[in-house]
Amino acid sequence: MPRVKAAQAGRQGPAKRRLAEHFAAGEIITDMNKKEWKLGSPIGQGGFGCIYLADMNSSKSVGNDAPCVVKVEPSDNGPLFTELKFYQRAAKPEQIQKWIRTHKLKYLGVPKYWGSGLHDKNGKSYRFMIIDRFGSDLQKIYEANAKRFSRKTVLQLSLRILDILEYIHEHEYVHGDIKASNLLLSYKNPDQVYLVDYGLAYRYCPEGTHKEYKEDPKRCHDGTVEFTSIDAHNGVAPSRRGDLEILGYCMIQWLSGHLPWEDNLKDPNYVRDSKIRYRENIASLMDKCFPEKNKPDEIAKYMETVKLLDYVEKPLYQKLRDILLQGLKAIGSKDDGKLDLTVVENGSLKAKPVAKKRKKEAEESVESSVEDMECSDKQTEEATQTRSKTRKRVQK
C-alpha cells in the first residue's frame, strides 16, 4: 500500500542519501548512556540504513533469538532522526511501564526505546537506535488470510490500537500512518500487536499548545492515500481525530476486504472526495462495504462518533472502546486478549479457507520478518520521499 509520494508534479524529490556500510557481527557500539551493545546478523537493509539483531554486550555472540534490533544509518541522513525524536520523548521503558500500571493494562503496543548514539567507523559517522524486536506485520497475515480478518479479530486489534493512540496522544504526538504493515506482532507473543514506524509522527501539541487548523496545499494527501484522514488530504497537519479516522478505515478494510475508493488510488482528490461524501452518510459507507447481513453496527457508531470531533478536541477514548466492546458482546464474545488471526468470518460473510501452504507461510513469517520494519528497498524509498517533507515539520 504505497504512500502518496512527496514529489508531485513540478516538485523535486528528496536528495539522494548515503547508504550505511555493513557492520560485522560482534561489533560493539556504545550509546549515549555509555551502555555497550553487540551487533548480530543483519536482518534487513533499506534505501539508507541497515537493521541488525542486537543485545547487551557480553562474551557471548548475539544469537538468532536476540531481544532487540538496532537501526543504523549515516548520521547526515534524516529519516531515523525524526523517528528517534519520538522515541526519546515518548517511548522510554519507564514511561511505558508507568502508563501500563496506572491504566491497568496487560501491555501497551508501543516499542520500547533502549538507547541511541553515534558510532564512528572508517572515518564515517553513523546514527543508531536500539528498540524491541518484533515478528510479522499484519499486512502479510492479512494477505495470507484471504484479505479478511474476523469481526472479533478486528475489534480486538482496534481496542489495543486505541490504547496505543491514547498513550502517544497524551505524550503530544500523533502517528499519522496507521495501517496493517505498520502493525507488528510481538516476537514471542502473537496476541500482542505493536504500532511501529514513527517517521510521520507529528508533535501536534508541543508544550501543551495545540497546532492551529491550517490548510497547506503543499502538504495535501500526506500519509497512505487509502487510509489517510480528510484533514491530511486537505493539507492540514495531523491531529488526534485524524488518527482515529484512519483507524476507522483500517477496521472497515480488515473486515470487508476493501474500501470503496481503492479502485482509483492514483487520484488522491477522488479518494478525498469519496471520503468526504461517505463521512456525510456513514450508513451508505456501511452498505457499500457490507452488503450482506450482520453489518458491524459498532464500526458505524465509531465512525459517527469520530466525525463529530473538532480538530483540537480531546477524544473520549473510553467511549470509543466501549463502542467496540459492545460489538464484541453483540457477537457473543468479549475482550479476552486473543487476536485469533487465522479465523475468517463476518456473520454470514465467510471467506474461502486459507490453503495450508499459505497458513504455514504466515506462521513462518512471524518468526523471520523483523525486516518488516523498513527493510525492503522499495518500501524504504517510498517512506523516504514522504519523510523528506515531513522531517521539516517535526518539532526538534
UniProtKB/Swiss-Prot annotation:
Activity-regulation annotation: Active in presence of Mn(2+), Mg(2+) and Zn(2+), but is not functional with Ca(2+) or Cu(2+). Has a higher affinity for Mn(2+) than for Mg(2+). RAN inhibits its autophosphorylation and its ability to phosphorylate histone H3.
InterPro entries hit by this protein: CK1_Ser-Thr_kinase, Kinase-like_dom_sf, Prot_kinase_dom, Protein_kinase_ATP_BS, Ser/Thr_kinase_AS
Q: Where is this region: Required for interaction with the nucleosome?
A: 387-393
Which EC number(s) does UniProt give?
Answer: 2.7.11.1
Key word Ion transport present in the record?
no
Report the residues modified as Phosphoserine. Answer: 376
Q: Catalytic activity annotated for this protein? A: L-seryl-[protein] + ATP = O-phospho-L-seryl-[protein] + ADP + H(+); L-threonyl-[protein] + ATP = O-phospho-L-threonyl-[protein] + ADP + H(+)
GO MF annotation terms? ATP binding; histone H2AX kinase activity; nucleosomal DNA binding; protein serine kinase activity; protein serine/threonine kinase activity
Highest rank taxon of the organism: Eukaryota
- Disordered: region residues: 352-396
Which residues form the Glycyl lysine isopeptide (Lys-Gly) (interchain with G-Cter in SUMO2) crosslink? 71
Q: Which residues bind ATP?
A: 43-51, 71
Acidic residues compositional bias: what residue ranges?
364-374
Gene3D superfamilies from the UniProt entry: Transferase(Phosphotransferase) domain 1 (1.10.510.10)
Record family assignment: Belongs to the protein kinase superfamily. CK1 Ser/Thr protein kinase family. VRK subfamily.
Q: What is this protein called?
A: Serine/threonine-protein kinase VRK1
